[in-house]
Amino acid sequence: MPHRYFTTEISDGTAVLRGADAHHLSRVMRGRLGDTVILCDGSAVEYTATITGFGDETVEFSVEPGYPSAAEPTVDVTLLVGYPKQDKLEQVIRHGVELGCDHFVPFFSRYCVAAPKKEEQKNERYNRIAFEAAKQCGRGILPDVALPLPNFGAVCRSLDQYDLVLFCYECGGAPLRQLLAEATPADGKKLKIAIITGAEGGFAAEEAEMAAKAGAKTVGLGPRILRCETAPLAVVSAVMTLTGNLE
């Protein structure tokens, strides 16, 4: 299978790869003239590209006409995750990208154990993890990780941009299958779904009420208590299965 790289410098049948990825292709992978790779422009369009030249930290290509990426799901999923301890968020981002998530928004809530610390520095690392995961699993876009929201109120104020908001609560809720069947995209294109999961301490009752008032649909995750790094991936997997994106 050809190696995959992301670049926005694709036009008129040519393309250029720069920086670390160009170094990787030319020096680490020892790419040669005539070798074929897959280039992605980050907007779910892929190109079959042939190496035509090497420069200082650049690789040049001729490219065939673009085609839609087969790896992109038919739903647009944003994962809003209660900020967990240690490296759990890295796990959620890495595996969430593999499952088809487009956006990740960490947040702090009442029962979060973690506290804000060097968030801009961490955010660079989180986006790098998402970038590497996207290349590894064959995504056609670059999923993004936002800086964390400071409290649950900020989460609720952001929810009006989605067609369906799933609030995952240990006290149960409506069947996921039913909620997905009833949802329709406002723009007639991809259904925009937000999934909200808690940190280690879960959610306060007041936060559940806030989510409901903001239009979120409460959904249960079965009779077992899931860890904070397991719950988001379980819900994403279920959403992708029920929408036909894991077939």
Please provide the spans of the model-predicted regions.
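Glycine/charged-rich beta-loop-alpha catalytic/anionic-binding loops adjacent to active sites
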Residues: 15-17, 74-78, 190-194, 212-221
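Hydrophobic side chains in well-ordered alpha-helices
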Residues: 25, 89-92, 207
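Structured adenosyl-cofactor binding patch, chiefly the S-adenosyl-L-methionine
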Residues: 205-247
